[in-house]
Amino acid sequence: MNNIIYIIGTCHGDTIGFKVEDLYKQLLEIKPDIILDESPIDNMWPMMDWLKGCADHSKKRGGGEAAAVLRYLEDHRAEVLPYDIKGRNDYFIKMKFFEKEQVYGEACSAYFKQPSANPTAFYLFKLIEGMGRRFGFHETKDKRTIFDINSPLCDVQVETYISLIRQVNKALFSLVPEFSQYERDFGKMMNFHARRDKAMISNILNYNSRFDDKTMVVLCGYFHRYALIKGLEGSQKKHGFSLISDLGSSDKVPQPKNS
């Protein structure tokens, strides 16, 4: 093994601070032999077709990480492999999480406009809403750079935010009876994301066992970063790899000799 594994969080497209061009520059600097793409492990599409489709879908935001990877592959050899949970896309379609999340959000907005809204629930809702604007998920107005979102500080912010999302919504379901109808689907969604993180970690370790003396880059939405780092950092000695998660310190670590 003796691989080096980089965890690089992205915003899945250009924001004010995060640029796909900067991700491309990181790939040029790291020169990965293996790139793990956040696509389902059972993806039936040829990887190049998948990347081209993703880049086209995100072209208004610079093509996302797919565009950076495709550009890197123009002049460099690297194997691109999927590592997300099996059946991800079909599960999202089946469960309609995005649609249900939108309905719940609209219900919250309508309820908290009422003068009779529960004051504690209102405070908690505004708290999590404010944190969402500051640490928001792939917000196009986010001013944080690729280095900002790939830092220990951002990892703490995201972990705290996700923990508060769980706790605040648990309180809202209790405080506002009309919200209780959304509790089951919310729980399923949060549990699925936790299962995704565990599956990602397992798949990364499986790939690590298949290669020797390689540099691997794991590309992920930055909301997954902290979970992947926590799940991998304690396994470095056992599984024979070095983990790099802070881009600011990447130049301090020697590169492996490619076989």
Q: Locations of the language-model features?
A:
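Short, high-confidence coil segments that cap the C-terminus of an alpha-helix
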Residues: P32, F211-K214
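Generic beta-sheet signal
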Residues: I4-Y6, K214-C220
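Short, flexible loop segments at boundaries between secondary-structure elements
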Residues: Q181-Y182, F186-G187, E233, H239-S259
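Hydrophobic, often amphipathic alpha-helical segments used for membrane interaction and targeting
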Residues: W50, H57-F211, G231
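A short acidic (Asp/Glu
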Residues: G17-F18, W45-W50, F92-M95, Y226-E233, ...
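Internal alpha/beta domain cores that form substrate/cofactor-binding pockets in large enzymes
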Residues: M1-I85, N89, K100
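Active-site-adjacent alpha-helix immediately C-terminal to a catalytic or transition-state-stabilizing loop
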Residues: K214, Y226-F241
